[in-house]
Amino acid sequence: MDKEHLKKNLQEKMEKALKVLDHELKGLRTGRASVNLLDSVTVEAYGSKMPLSQVASLSTPDARTINVQVWDKSMVSSVEKGITIANLGLTPATDGQLIRLPIPALTEERRTELVKLAHKYGEDTKISLRNIRRDGNEALKKLEKDNVIAKDEHHSLSEQVQKLTDDYSSKVDSVIKQKEQEIMTV
């Protein structure tokens, strides 16, 4: 593995870690309606489990409601059951093929729990970034040992890997700070 490929590989892995964090944070309920809350909901449909988005269209008519428009009338009870089983703290209100999900306001205690969880996700991501950095530094040592790069070049590349790690770590901090503000906004 050459040094350019190594840097590109490290950057891709760090970008992937950031995407995982984004996905985890989207699942946190902020008191504001978002169809992403229902990403984890699966529905028993046509003999198999399917994501909710494959049997209904999802929309947010206002900041406190999610509408689930079920395409097949026979699926309404399955969709309700799937939403209830997902344990999201949402109570489905059915009106024909339309299921309304009012988003209850978050209590101060629940907001604090969500902020702690967001920080935990952030810390897990930083641990991933440090592991990626460690793997990169080990690969650099191997390149130096195999005489592919010189000692001073190894030092320079190590600094670049550290800078890359610092950059992504600060991105994680800003994403978490933004999510914290979103959660704490009443």
UniProtKB/Swiss-Prot annotation:
**Domain of life (superkingdom):** Bacteria
User: What's one GO BP annotation on this UniProt entry?
Assistant: cytoplasmic translational termination
Instruction: Give the UniProt entry's GO cellular component terms.
Output: cytosol
Localization, per the record, is: Cytoplasm
| Cited InterPro entries | Ribosome_recyc_fac (IPR002661), Ribosome_recyc_fac_dom (IPR023584), RRF_sf (IPR036191)
| Keywords attached to this entry | Cytoplasm, Protein biosynthesis
Report the SS bond pairs: none
Answer yes or no on keyword Transmembrane.
Answer: no
Write out the GO MF terms: ribosomal large subunit binding
Protein purpose:
Responsible for the release of ribosomes from messenger RNA at the termination of protein biosynthesis. May increase the efficiency of translation by recycling ribosomes from one round of translation to another.
Which family does the UniProt entry place this protein in? Belongs to the RRF family.
Q: What is this protein called?
A: Ribosome-recycling factor
Please tell me the species this chain comes from.
Rickettsia peacockii (strain Rustic)
